[in-house]
Amino acid sequence: KEIENGVELNYISEDGEENYPGQLDVKVTYTLKENSLVINYKATTNKTTICNLTNHTYFNLNGYGNILQHQVQILADYFTENNQESIPTGKIIPVENTPMDFRNPQYIEKDINNEYYQIKYAKGFDNNWVLNNYNGEIRKIATAYSELSGIELEVSTDLPGIQFYSGN
């Protein structure tokens, strides 16, 4: 349904759907506020169950072509290692001295073809970065910038990690 400056989407997952226990009532709102897109999730259930809501929005700040000239910064000293099937191994690895280090703005194209095993597995970037200074409060954790368009995307969250995918 339409709400002021946005839209609210609702979904009910009935008890047993996808073999998960409990009825899960989900509400997602997308709101435009002062040049920002705010996405809020709310879910309630009547039984103990697993719920891991996420967003798979992809941005090309140029408006066309590829994203290799985008500059990305991720405020994270560590990332989660993946196996060859892109499944997390549980191992947390420092970004320092690896092509996974986006603590300072880097062009995506700089290391997208690097021989580093994590990049080779995914044919680009597709990992979770473990964010610095996690305290459960909303804070700025990443930026992407296009010199071509002059558009900068700021990402904020109250969660401990971010998945960065380069459209491999």
Regions found by a protein language model. Name each.
Residues 1-168:
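An exposed, glycine/acidic-rich loop-and-rim segment of catalytic or binding clefts
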